[in-house]
Structures are given as C-alpha cells and as structure tokens.
C-alpha cells in the first residue's frame, strides 16, 4: 500500500505499445515458439501480458497498456515461449529489455523504437537474439485512434543498401546481395554495390540509427535535434525503396504542372501557365533515360513494359488502365537515382512541350500508345506476378479416387495452408500409375468441378431454366457444413487460375463482378433474369401511380415453400410510390443477387483470395475474369486444325483427313469430350489452341500415327496433348474407335 501511495505523489501516465518482435531465437529444431510479451513496472505491482502469437519468430501484437510511472520506476519487457513456461522456473525465456528512468524519459513521445533483446543477467546461459519494437506516449499525446504500422519496415534500415535478410528452412538467418546475387552468413556492414564495384560512391541512405539497448538505458532515446527528424525522413524513404511490394508516393509536380489523362488512357502533363502539354514527366530530368533498370528494382504490381511499333519503350498501368512513357520507378525514386549518380539537381527549365492538338501526323509514333483491353498481355502480367509467389521447392500432392473425388479432395485441400496450394500441383488417382506433368491435374479439375458445381449437391443452382449458368443456392444451409464447402470451392477456383488450368462450368456475369468487388446494378439483371429486369425497367420508366399495388416486400420459393422477405424494416406495410420506386428497384436488385447468400459468397471469396490476392485482379473486368477461370467454352475447329502438330503423318494422310471429318461431325459436347480425352480439359485457353500447355510449357495438340493393331483404341497422352491413332483401314472404323475411346475409357498409366 505504501508503494501505491508513493506513486500517487508524482507518477505520470504513459501508454506503452508493444508492436512486434523480430528474429527471435529458435530453441527447438522442429517447432517455432508461441510468443507473448510480458510488461512489468518493477516494484509497483503493474503487470500485463500480450496475446500469444503461435508458431513464429516474428510475432506481431500491436497492443497497448496504460502505465503509472514514478520518477525512479523502471519497465521490464520480456518475451516468452508459451509452450515452455509451465515446465520449470525461467523456462521459455526468449529475451528482455529493461528501461530505466532516464531511458523512459528519452524514449517518451519519439515514436516506435527498436530495442535489442538481452539476457536476464550476465551469468544467464540462455541464448537470446532479436529485437522488440515499442513506443511510449505521454497521456496528453494519446489520440483516440491507433496508428497503423507496417512492422517489417521498422527493421529494413538495419541493413545497408542492396541487402536483404532471409531465413533458411532451419531458421538460420542469411543475407542476400541483390547486386552480386550472392548470399552470406555474416551480417553486412557496407552497401551491396561496394562488393562488386569498390570505386562506386556510397549510397546516401546507408544511415543507420544507433541501436537502443535495454540493459542500462544509457543509449536509449533520441533528442529533438532537427537533424534526427531529417534522418528519419530519409530512412523512411530508404525503407520504401527497399520494399519489394510498395511504390511510395512520388514527389509533388513542379509548380504550374498538372497530371492529366486522355480519354484513351494516356497520361500527360499540362503546364497551366502556358497551356502546353508534354508526355514527359517534368519531375524526371530527360538525361535519366539511360538509368540501369536493375538499380530501380521491379515494376510496381500491375505495371508492364511494352514497346511501340517503332521500338520505343512505354509503361502500362493495368490498375488504372493508363499508359505513359516515364518509368514509374523513376518518378518515385528520383532522389535515390540522382544521389546514386552523385549528381546535384540543378534548376531545370520547363521541359520542351508540344500541344496535343498541334501534334503532327508524322510524329504520331511518338504518342503514348492508348490503353487497350489486351487480355493476353494482362494475363501474361498476372502469370508473372503469380510465378513470383510460387515456392521453388516442394509439391502440393493430392491423391484421390475417382469414385470419391469430391469428398477426398475436400478433406485434403482444406487441411492445407494457403501457401501450400501455391506449390507445384501433383495429382494422383488411386490405383493408377500416371505421372502428373499437367494432364492429370487438368483431368482432376475437370472431374472435380463437375461434382462440386453440380446442383444435385445443393451448393449451386441454375440461374435460369434455359441457360445453364450457375449461381449460389440461397438454401444451401440444408448442408450444415455448407460454408466450409464454399471455402473449398473458392480455393479450387484459385488453384485453377494459379496453376494455369480451368474450371469446367460457368457462373453468371454478376458473380464474377462480385468476385472482383464491384457493385451490382440493374443492368446486371438482364442476363440473369430478363423478365424481372424488364419489369423493373418498366417501373422506372413509367408512372406507377394507381397502377401497381406493390409494397417493400417480395416473395420467393424455397423448396416449394413460399417465403416473404421485407426489403426494409416493416416493408410489408410500406407501399411503393412514384417517389420511392427507385429505392424499391435498388433494394430489389440487391436482394435478388444477395438473398441469403452473403455468408456463402464471403466464404467462397475468402478461399479464392487465399490463392489469388485480390489486388492482382484489378486490371480485369468480369468478362475477362470469366475467361481466366473457365477458359473458352466454344471450340473453334479451324483454329484447332491450324494449331495441330502431325507426327509420322501428313495433312494428306487418311488418318488425319478422317480425324478432322469425325471432329466436324461431332456436336459441341462430343468435341469437348474429345478435347478432354486428349488434353485433360474440355476448355480452350483464352488465347486459343496455340496456347495449349504441356509438361514443360506450350505444346500443340498432336496427332500421332502409330504402328499398332487396328483393333486397338486410340490412346491419349494428356501431359503432351497427343493422341496416338493406329492406321485404321476405313473412316467408319476410325469413327467407331474414336467414339468408344472418348465415351468409355478413363484412367492413367505409365508406359
């Protein structure tokens, strides 16, 4: 009690925020610690513990505590492994920081600070490693909202320019030199560029702050020197540059300039005082065109480099659907480029400008190309982004039986972590010896999508009786595990896109629009329910006074039972009038697409985005997303013919002529079955047959005439998109054998 009273004589209230820790020591070979932090105001009885973050050496807590600190009080922040604290006294200790009174005063109101973890005492034998990030705020500086902080960037300035810290599978830290593309165990002390070119000037951003240790408090804290603030700004710019997933905000345009975009998506810059325009970004000196692109790092997500017809490089922003000549990395990292070249930026004259309306025809080739809805290029950009996420080692192995493909796939996929689904897909059908070089995975997705999208299971239903497009079944809750199954469906759709395959089935266009996070409008109703669309349009275009007797209540049929739904509270008693009909239509459309399916759709979207991050799809619209997920449903026979390779036969061979004669006689369903028999998928890539994929990249559809008995059936090699056909004597025999093969056979084997 005396201690409590002494604190009231002059204690101050401080808010301690424990943000995160990094590089904690790994003491178990097979397991990572379940880490939590403990905060103690020594001798005061104040004690707090953060939540436990499981299985990580880099826990993130972002939790705050209000502490009453006296003049002589100290704070001890310790990190523990929850898995071991119950075994014996002191077990599970991972490191601590002790802040004495002078250190507390210097740390106060200086923002987040990185503190090195230390041992409990000098004679302690525990191995300790890592840092913890905390902040101390005075009571009068505590705001109502918390600040969002990216923990990873608080550690970036530990390393000189050009270096990156990575961890091996066993937890050991290694350092990657992005300039020389080498690794080492020792912590680097010089910029990466010095290891390859000793004569090169130092980067102006090798500017490490003095580490703050918590053992005695002597070096903890920072002063209010303006130079410190400037160092912080420069360090933040450096961290932004080193980040591989973030392009920080470009500097402001020079006074008098505005950035604008033409109707065709071309970015230009207008000098408002003179009224003239330029394609060139005035923030970037024109003599920087020869900068080595490797020094600037990768393009931001969603950007792509292309060339004009004359070979000039330009840049496409798929996120905003614009084009420009200026490298987006230059305008954002201009200060870095200039310092690296050891140049001082002198006053620049306004860049040479040309009025858009006066641009002569003969220099039209210098105009920034218009943004095109070029799906092939956008898909290529998406594939590049996804390939960077795929681990270089390991496989996603799934073994199922054909009879229980839905349930067995569900159990195996749902117990995997999302990042495991990024590994190379290896599918095996139980009892079959086929090796998966792509063909087995295609057939697995083909068969699985048939089952999981089948309205018989109650997850989906046909949107209309006359068009077999699917939508989520609002009554899917008859299966108590339906949300988990929708999560599974989303993962399978994401896996198909990630690994370059397709789902055999189609949803309504509004479904893809919702998957992209776009709002639904009345126009979207036309393709799903044209009768309802026409009725709602008529309501909007005509005076309904005295004509309609509607209320804000609608009916729908659920398994034969007529159920009423109020579009707004007490809607059953609220009539629809000329003044409220727009609200009625808006609520009706929203209910029609979301009635009882909010939870189902969110579960599906969650599964899809676990494999395909949402931001990678910004460049696509709903029609393009449908092609990415489902491929082309209609088979173009002429495209098929022109992109077919012949082996041991020619275009004049009877086998080839009869094969195409049979294909042309097939209906769409049989053509799809034939394509599925040979390639493993009934869908055509959106680029057409020229983009069919094999075991090691693009591989055309191949007809191979083999020397075998004409009593044998044709044989398919799905991993190579090849069909082996014996030299049948007549067209009728080829037709019969081909039909039998695609209708009656299944299974894989190894020759």
From Swiss-Prot:
SMART domains (UniProt xref): C2, HECTc, WW
Residue ranges that the Swiss-Prot or TrEMBL entry lists as coiled coil: none
Span of domain WW: 157-190, 251-284, 297-330
Keywords from the UniProt entry: Cell membrane, Cytoplasm, Membrane, Nucleus, Repeat, Transferase, Ubl conjugation pathway
EC number in record: 2.3.2.26
BP GO annotations: negative regulation of BMP signaling pathway; proteasome-mediated ubiquitin-dependent protein catabolic process; protein ubiquitination
Pathway entry: Protein modification; protein ubiquitination
GO cellular-component term (any): nucleus
Composition skew (Polar residues), residue ranges: 214-226
Gene3D superfamilies found in the cross-reference section: 2.20.70.10, C2 domain, Hect, E3 ligase catalytic domain, Hect, E3 ligase catalytic domains
Principal localisation: nucleus
Function: E3 ubiquitin-protein ligase which accepts ubiquitin from an E2 ubiquitin-conjugating enzyme in the form of a thioester and then directly transfers the ubiquitin to targeted substrates.
Name this protein carries in UniProt: E3 ubiquitin-protein ligase SMURF2
Name of the gene encoding the protein in the UniProt record: smurf2
């Amino acid at each position: 009690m005396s201690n409590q009273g002494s604190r009231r004589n002059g204690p101050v209230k401080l808010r301690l925020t424990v943000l995160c820790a990094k590089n904690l020591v790994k003491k178990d070979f097979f397991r990572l610690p379940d880490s939590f932090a403990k905060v103690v105001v020594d001798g005061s009885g104040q004690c707090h513990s953060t939540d436990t973050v499981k299985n990580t050496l880099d826990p993130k807590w972002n939790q705050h505590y209000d502490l009453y600190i006296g003049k002589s009080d100290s704070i001890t922040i310790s990190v523990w492994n929850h898995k071991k604290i119950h075994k014996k006294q002191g077990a599970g200790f991972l490191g601590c920081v002790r802040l004495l009174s002078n250190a507390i005063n210097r740390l106060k109101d200086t923002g987040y600070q990185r503190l090195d973890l230390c041992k409990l005492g000098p004679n302690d034998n525990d191995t300790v490693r890592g840092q913890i990030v905390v902040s101390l705020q005075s009571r009068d500086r505590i705001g109502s909202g918390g600040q969002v902080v990216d923990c990873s960037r608080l550690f970036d300035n530990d390393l000189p320019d050009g270096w990156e810290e990575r961890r091996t599978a066993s937890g050991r830290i290694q350092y990657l030199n992005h300039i020389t593309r080498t690794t080492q165990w020792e912590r680097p002390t010089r910029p990466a560029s010095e290891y390859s070119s000793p004569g090169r000037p130092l980067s102006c951003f090798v500017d490490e702050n003095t580490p703050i240790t918590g053992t005695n408090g002597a070096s903890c804290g920072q002063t209010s020197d303006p130079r410190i603030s400037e160092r912080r700004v420069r360090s933040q710019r450096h961290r932004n540059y080193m980040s591989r997933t973030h392009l920080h905000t470009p500097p402001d345009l020079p006074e008098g300039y505005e950035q604008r975009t033409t109707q065709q998506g071309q970015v230009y810059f207008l000098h408002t005082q003179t009224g003239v325009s330029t394609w060139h970004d005035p923030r970037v000196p024109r003599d920087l065109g020869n900068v080595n692109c490797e020094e600037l790092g990768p393009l931001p997500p969603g950007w792509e480099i292309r060339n004009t017809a004359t070979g000039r490089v330009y840049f496409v922003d798929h996120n905003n659907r614009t084009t420009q000549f200026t490298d987006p990395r230059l305008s954002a990292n201009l200060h870095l480029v200039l310092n690296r070249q050891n140049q001082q930026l002198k006053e620049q004259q306004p860049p040479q400008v040309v009025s858009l309306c006066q641009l002569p025809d003969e220099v039209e080739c210098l105009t920034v190309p218009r943004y095109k809805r070029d799906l092939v290029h956008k898909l290529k950009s998406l594939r590049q982004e996804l390939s960077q996420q795929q681990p270089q080692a390991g496989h996603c192995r799934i073994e199922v039986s054909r009879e229980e493909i839905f349930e067995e796939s569900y159990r195996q996929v749902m117990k995997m972590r999302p990042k495991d689904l990024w590994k190379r897909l290896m599918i095996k059908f139980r009892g079959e010896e086929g090796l998966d070089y792509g063909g087995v995975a295609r057939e697995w997705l083909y068969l699985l999508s048939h089952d999981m999208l089948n309205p018989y299971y109650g997850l989906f239903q046909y949107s209309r009786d006359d068009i077999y497009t699917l939508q989520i079944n609002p009554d899917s809750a008859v299966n108590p595990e339906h949300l988990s199954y929708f999560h599974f469906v989303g993962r399978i759709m994401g896996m198909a896109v990630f690994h370059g395959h397709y789902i055999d089935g189609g949803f309504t266009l509004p479904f893809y629009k919702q998957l992209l996070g776009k709002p639904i409008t009345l126009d979207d109703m036309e393709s799903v329910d044209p009768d309802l669309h026409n009725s709602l349009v008529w309501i909007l275009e005509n005076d309904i006074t005295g004509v309609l007797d509607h209320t804000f209540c609608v009916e729908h049929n659920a398994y034969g039972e007529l159920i009423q739904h109020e579009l707004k509270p007490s809607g059953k008693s609220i009539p629809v009038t000329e003044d409220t009909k727009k609200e009625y239509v808006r609520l009706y459309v929203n209910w029609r697409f979301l009635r009882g399916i909010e939870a189902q759709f969110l579960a599906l979207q969650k599964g899809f985005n676990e494999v395909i991050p949402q931001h990678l799809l910004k460049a696509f619209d709903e029609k393009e997303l449908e092609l990415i997920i489902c491929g082309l449903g209609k088979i173009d026979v002429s495209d098929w013919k022109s992109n077919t390779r012949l082996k041991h036969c020619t275009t004049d061979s009877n086998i080839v002529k009869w094969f195409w004669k049979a294909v042309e006689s097939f209906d769409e369903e049989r053509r799809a079955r034939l394509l599925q028999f040979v390639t493993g998928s009934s869908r055509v890539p959106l680029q057409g047959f020229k983009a069919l994929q094999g075991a090691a990249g693009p591989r055309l559809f191949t007809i191979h005439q083999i020397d075998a008995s004409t009593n044998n059936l044709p044989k398919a090699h799905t991993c190579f998109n090849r069909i082996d056909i014996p030299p049948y004597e007549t067209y009728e025999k080829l037709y019969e054998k081909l039909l039998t093969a695609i209708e009656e056979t299944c299974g894989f084997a190894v020759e």
